[in-house]
Amino acid sequence: MNTYAQESKLRLKTKIGADGRCVIEDNFFTPPFKLMAPFYPKDDLAEIMLLAVSPGLMKGDAQDMQLSIGQNCKLRITSQSFEKIHNTEDGFASRDMHIVVGENAFLDFAPFPLIPFENAHFKGNTTISLRSSSQLLYSEIIVAGRVARNELFKFNRLHTKISILQDEKPIYYDNTILDPKTTDMNNMCMFDGYTHYLNLVLVNCPIELSGVRGLIEESEGVDGAVSEIASSHLCVKALAKGSEPLLHLREKIARFTTQTITQKV
């Protein structure tokens, strides 16, 4: 059962406004969601912060998010803080998110890290639909638990799926299953002693594989790599012993990408 009286829903639709910048065309949300009005940190790039007025996700919480980024929009979506998944007891918390990015539109989806507490169980499913001219920078950062309390990999289970389609054809699928009961999370094929994991996907972004590799190599405290996926798109996987190194790496990649995109005439 959801902690709230109804399923938690968020709807956001954007378009190009009269001044040529991305604006909110329509939105709807139920508790605990809220939206901040867009602001414009650089040129025609809009930034919207998603707010969740709650201490975190609990047993039975179910979130349904639908985001539609209009044609020619340039938008960065952020969150207000680290997201906490509390003890879900014998249940789980879930999120289903569907994102549509229109023609010649750019979306930088940059939430803060996800922290599963002891005995937390979370299921996340994200589907992103793009056009051939859409540009996407999408990431998630997963933490091993409440690291400061030495509560590492004490969560029950964490399962996230990311599916990206371009013109209705699948170009990327990620199926992350972290189950400490059945897998040694410190195995060299898993976290290998690290506590924070970054998964970042770039589609049609104006940055070369060699450029991303250089940013990874110059990032202190980061063990990561970049690989090419379908049609020369890029995927970055990185580990660290804190959130800051991964957030800094992500920001460097995003800064290079958005500077190039917003400079286009």
Swiss-Prot record:
**Cellular component terms (Gene Ontology):** cytoplasm
Q: Where in the cell is it found?
A: Cytoplasm
Q: What InterPro entries does the entry give?
A: UreD (IPR002669)
A single Gene Ontology MF term assigned here is: nickel cation binding
* UniProt KW keywords: Chaperone, Cytoplasm, Nickel insertion
Chaperone found in the keyword field: yes
HAMAP family attached to this UniProt entry: UreD
Q: What does this protein do?
A: Required for maturation of urease via the functional incorporation of the urease nickel metallocenter.
Family of this protein = Belongs to the UreD family.
Q: How does it assemble?
A: UreH, UreF and UreG form a complex that acts as a GTP-hydrolysis-dependent molecular chaperone, activating the urease apoprotein by helping to assemble the nickel containing metallocenter of UreC. The UreE protein probably delivers the nickel.
Q: What is this protein called?
A: Urease accessory protein UreH
Organism from which the protein derives: Helicobacter pylori (strain P12)
Q: What is the lineage of its organism?
A: Bacteria, Pseudomonadati, Campylobacterota, Epsilonproteobacteria, Campylobacterales
